[in-house]
């Protein structure tokens, strides 16, 4: 009976160890130990119970140590996996946040550039309008409160500058006998201005000549454009017309062999 009770106790301990270390690699080592213990008990039925208990305790301690070692071996692997997952998650979050920040930065840069371009265009238009207003102030318009568009202002300024240039050139050419030239050229510049042609035509029935002509004579007879109190034996008459009849001829630059600020015009000279 004594031998049978010890055998039962050993079997129960082995069953407990098997249940505890079923997932550990030390199970394979424990199973041969238990089988060898059974064989030894069968071979030596007369062995003392203290030795058998000692062997059973040693086997149980070894099994427990193997289970603990297996659990400790699994824990670092699990911890490493968790750490790896934790490292992956922040990297993905950082990538998403970086992409969002990049998109926001691009949108902010585009908006800033658009605002700067709008400000530059607004300033350019303000400067252009201010320059045209200053040009309208020095141009003689009839009536004085006439509103000129941008293209009309530029065309009238071109005609007015041309008339002043012709006045200076003919005054130098004719000497002191060209008293009536500035008035004639000024009246012609008025005819070239928008709204001035109708006013001038309503006051006088004469229309501007199609081409610019002038003549120098030694007769004291005054012409239509020379003042009646002129005492010079020479008289110069000028009836300038528009610098050109069409827009293409109007805006053509002067040839390089002529004066740089006087446009080239066909001039017919009749000297008697």
Curated annotation (Swiss-Prot):
GO molecular function annotations of the record: DNA-binding transcription factor activity, RNA polymerase II-specific; E-box binding; protein dimerization activity; sequence-specific double-stranded DNA binding
Pfam family, one: HLH
Tagged with keyword Signal: no
Top-rank taxon: Eukaryota
Annotated region described as Disordered, given as residue ranges: 30-69, 197-264
GO CC terms in record: chromatin; nucleus
PANTHER family: BASIC HELIX-LOOP-HELIX PROTEIN NEUROGENIN-RELATED, NEUROGENIN-2
The protein, known as: Neurogenin-2
Organism, as annotated: Homo sapiens (Human)
Biological classification of the source: Eukaryota, Metazoa, Chordata, Craniata, Vertebrata
Gene behind the chain: NEUROG2
